[in-house]
């Protein structure tokens, strides 16, 4: 019975951003791309990218080009948490500053239209432990250590 079954080739879901696949996104101009983005990102691109943002966009392809084949590119560090992730940034490694350290972020196609800062958390999430002295009325009966 196993011989008669035809093995199905595994198919992976192809990435699309609002119905447009990544290859077409890369070929689009900024004006066409802006029509797909949300209002906040449209406004950002419409007002133009500043010099710092332009220099980041120049450094990312350079790092990708210098990387050996089948290897991840060198990390490009930046403080630009407000940079909109564009399709040409996909596949790059970016070190996003969170106020203390640079968090490495690998740009994936699903991140298009988001900001770099969304992927580098600026605070340490709270780990709730035992209550301290005077936290509640019942804490009077909690022994000290």
From Swiss-Prot:
Component of the small ribosomal subunit. The ribosome is a large ribonucleoprotein complex responsible for the synthesis of proteins in the cell. It is found in: Cytoplasm. Component of the small ribosomal subunit. Belongs to the universal ribosomal protein uS19 family. The keyword Coiled coil does not apply. This is Small ribosomal subunit protein uS19. GO terms for molecular function: RNA binding; structural constituent of ribosome. One of its GO terms (biological process) is ribosomal small subunit assembly. One of its GO terms (cellular component) is cytosolic small ribosomal subunit. Its main location: cytoplasm. Keywords: Cytoplasm, Ribonucleoprotein, Ribosomal protein.
